[in-house]
Amino acid sequence: MDKLNFLIIVAPKNNGDKTIKKLGKLINYPSVSRGRGTAPNSALATLGIGEPEKDVIFCFALKDDVEKIYDILYNKLGFIQKHLGIALTVPVSAVGGRLTYDLLSGDKTDLRTHKKGWFNV
């Protein structure tokens, strides 16, 4: 189960849906929330952070796809430039069982017919 990663992507305000669309099938179960920093505007300008409001994307991806995801973020969405975004991954070493792992990693198996020997609905 160590091949699954939880991604947190901080994108420019109103770019969450665009980011999700660009990443396409490389990510699973994306969710966008609005985020707002707490630093005063003068500190933001000094640090080169830009606007305090951002889109925060939470999603899952397979470890083998993380490099492709970063490539899209940096080269196609411009995250390499100041003010445009940041991303990080956290390995998911344990989840609530094999079925949960399969679902989060993109297995679209119908739960009612899921019969791999360890879970039946």
Identify the role of each PLM range.
Residues 1-121:
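Positively charged, small/polar-rich N-terminal and surface patches that mediate targeting and assembly
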